[in-house]
């Protein structure tokens, strides 16, 4: 029983310290910050976190400071396209609970647009964004334009591109 309490105490300390270290690295914003726009099916929790699992769901914002990280939880393993200033910057793998993920770093500190789009099917995991972490000089700013029209492709894996990255059908 004592061992159980010890493990619980260590787990709580690790969660607290990861949140503390994220806060000490820069500015922290909730997942539902008004400067972040989500497109797709999402669920906003009372603590300000945002959850989603549908492929194609994305969030976008603008930011300064040259660095942006996320504190996220994932029920499985998901992959995301990260676009900076409308150019594919990288592909990010998200897994684990209360994980600090570096989305963008090493770019200049001017204003940049950022979009992060889920590319994995929902069956491979649900993502919850708890916090955005920016550099100490960083700020989030809302995207200036709201798209009034979207093109949606509805169909099977041939039309929608399911499995274009996998070597076999069980890969996300």
Q: Which residues does each predicted region cover?
A:
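Bacterial Sec-dependent N-terminal signal peptides
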Residues: 1-27
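N-terminal secretory targeting modules
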Residues: 20-154, 158-172
